[in-house]
């Protein structure tokens, strides 16, 4: 407040506006509060010498109330109301502030210079294509030509055979045979010539003369290759018991395989696991003879205008190619020649980014992509593609990708700024960046173009970065190595994201805070003239009293007083001066609980003034709210009416909320530089494929189901066949008959031998031998009997009857010998001779039947002649003797 008697100083317009707002709020506050009742709860007794104002506003002299007059019965006392306020709103401390004497003076600090608000980095939006190191090998189709040579040594026993050794080797197919036989006719020679221990050796299939054998498709084929061969079965030598025999098998194999080669492409490996120490790009065309090779010149041949033939269908290719053929000690390999550029590229495209922001951070660029959640750091100097070895594909693929993305997304809203730029980022990533400019800022195109030109390497033209250099590389080239993990770029993206957000937020807060303090300093300087005590207290941080001493403030420390030691009077009228009233309530207080009572006047914000000089003319309709303790007291017509808590008065906040943007959520997506398939396929040799092919080789080019059993007579038949084969057509015809007869004999003998080798057959043969021995014994006895007594042996029954008939005669007397009949004896002899003739005729007829028809007829004629012979000279005997009759 200004000193008394001095005119009010001129206030600036912002201060006047602020004071007007405060005054309007002060006038609105009583209206917002509850209107006092007609019969207030605590209406003080008016003094007798103070007049009560009427409705017209003219005051009537009425006596002033006493200093501590009590209220009427039935109304709450002021002390009780204050106690309720303190119990409800909490305790509040009062302060007694003595007037400052000028012993301590203070001044406000001058405005400070504020930091500049961060205006952000120089961002450039654009399209990016990120390239990585190409770890995939160069793959191409190759054809292997070789002959599997197998020499087996077998020992044959009587009942079994045993392999004593197997020699296996591979021999290359000569160039002439590949061109004139395999590719021209689909056949292969049955011989194999190869060098081992510096000596040339020749193997003949089946140990026979050289001939052409047709190639047939392999029985089992893989998804990536085909194969052809000439024979399924291994040749085994002929069986000769107790001798060692040798047999040779030559299997000509043509196999399509996959070949791989990795940087620097000095060698390649076949899917079978065989290494070829020659660059796949070696040849005699376009300067390719400078590529690496480890073989002599006569082992390599390059054929122009080569038409490859499909050995399965016999069809010839429609277009000719340049064919490379190389002979190694084990095989011959052929492949289609191709130039090194652009067949291979040391870089490959990794990601296409539709939105890539490029920000300047000191001497580096940071390329950020929200889609990839990554930030790549690169030098601000462009990277020349001519420094990368075999990178012709980068410029072509980058331009194609940029043009495709631009036409799809930015064709109607943006324009391209300059050419595609290339930057080598940390981790070995090559970024092809195409800056874009929106159509709204197209007028800045020239400025941006000039800026881009200044960033180019010294001495470079505008098309150098986008257009690959000449085919001849500079003397020193390098290969970009890309890390297998991109986590560092993702961490960089996270750090940049948080750093950008926090730095922008804190920078703007610091700038706004500084500017606010400087602006508030002006208000503080003007407000201290109105209420220096409040300004000084707010500035110092504790309750003080202050007054202006020119351009400085004199301050004094306030003494705190407990709320229980403060008593408020319920009337603010001045008894001695009619028409004059106190502008603020009167209070009595004690510094200590048992100290003397001191009179004072309630100031602002619970300040107790030791002087009661705050006066004003009494007015009609007086209503005031005064802060007392933790609440408010309401005075109406200069008398206490009732109390209010702070919550009963509508609060108008002067606090300015600090609206800070929270850090936005961001989800990381899985990101791989190289997939599992790329890592698996990055090696020069695929061991899985090698093992699969090696184990499938026997199934593809050999018959594993057919079993050849050793034949002891194979040598005999082979010799006979060779003998009759050399006699021409007649010899072959005779040979068939002889071979049939010999085969029958051998089969019979083999059948008997097989029967005897059977246990049941041996038992049967043993029984037959015993039966034969028994029959021979009985036959021998019969022959001996026949020699001793033919009649008894031949006619045992007749002899027995004759013997029984002659027995009585012999036993009847001595005259028996004399009675012997000579005629009967002669008849008996005749009968024996007749029986011998009959037996001879039967034997003759039996032999004639065996000899044939002519002999049988001769026997019949002889029989007829014998039957027509003269009648015998004897007659049959009668049953009774004539002498007896």
From Swiss-Prot:
Compositional bias per record (Low complexity), positions renumbered to this chain: 29-46
Residues carrying sugar: 68, 122, 379, 411, 659
Signal peptide (residue range): 1-34
Gene Ontology biological process terms from the UniProt entry: symbiont entry into host cell; virion attachment to host cell
Motif (Internalization motif): 874-877
Bias-annotated ranges (Acidic residues): 47-58
Cystine pairings recorded for this chain: 97-558, 114-514, 188-252, 345-393, 581-618
Placement of sequence motif Golgi targeting: 834-837
GO cellular component: host cell endosome membrane; host cell Golgi membrane; host cell plasma membrane; membrane; viral envelope; virion membrane
Topological domain spans for side Intravirion: 781-885
Pfam families (UniProt xref): Glycoprot_B_PH1 (PF17416), Glycoprot_B_PH2 (PF17417), Glycoprotein_B (PF00606)
Membrane topology: Single-pass type I membrane protein
Residue ranges crossing the lipid bilayer per the database entry: 760-780
Function, in words: Envelope glycoprotein that forms spikes at the surface of virion envelope. Essential for the initial attachment to heparan sulfate moieties of the host cell surface proteoglycans. Involved in fusion of viral and cellular membranes leading to virus entry into the host cell. Following initial binding to its host receptors, membrane fusion is mediated by the fusion machinery composed at least of gB and the heterodimer gH/gL. May be involved in the fusion between the virion envelope and the outer nuclear membrane during virion egress.
HAMAP family in alphabetical order: HSV_GB (MF_04032)
Subunit field text: Homotrimer; disulfide-linked. Binds to heparan sulfate proteoglycans. Interacts with gH/gL heterodimer.
The name this protein goes by in its record: Envelope glycoprotein B
Organism of this sequence: Herpes simplex virus type 2 (strain SA8) (Simian agent 8)
Lineage of the species this protein comes from: Viruses, Duplodnaviria, Heunggongvirae, Peploviricota, Herviviricetes
